[in-house]
Design a protein with these regions (language model features):
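N-terminal, polar/charged subdomain of small-to-medium soluble alpha/beta proteins
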Residues: 1-122
């Protein structure tokens, strides 16, 4: 059984996309994280130092989203996943979902999204 830390529906405003107007005007992106790790020690000790801080995960997403412009949300999701794994040895794998609710597509849709999973073997 795998334990997970989950961050759902994090909203960031950023300037990602292949179209010049996306990079100029920016738009909302929604991000979910699911970090697989052993949480037994955190549950037993009941101290913040025994786990990964949720707010630090949120900060990573905000930092990467604002640090540079990505053409593809695939690249954004991959960068978030790899950064989380590089900063937290206790996380075994991470799944990152990036949703783009306002994709410039001539159709009525809720959102487009990508989901990537990275682990220590990637």
């Amino acid at each position: 059984m795998t334990d997970r830390i989950i961050v759902k529906d994090l909203v960031v405003f950023a300037y990602h996309g292949v179209h010049p107007e996306e990079q100029r005007l920016g738009q909302r992106f929604e991000v979910d994280l699911s970090c697989a790790m052993n949480l037994r020690e955190a549950a037993k000790r009941d101290t913040e130092g025994a786990t990964v801080s949720y707010s630090s995960l949120v900060e990573i997403v905000a930092e990467i989203s604002s640090r540079r412009t990505f053409f593809l949300i695939e690249a954004l999701a991959d960068d978030i996943a790899r950064t989380i794994l590089s900063r937290y040895a206790q996380i075994d794998a991470v799944t990152v979902t990036v949703r783009k609710p306002s994709a410039p597509i001539p159709a009525t849709l809720g959102y487009v999204a990508v989901e990537v999973t990275r682990d220590r073997n990637d």
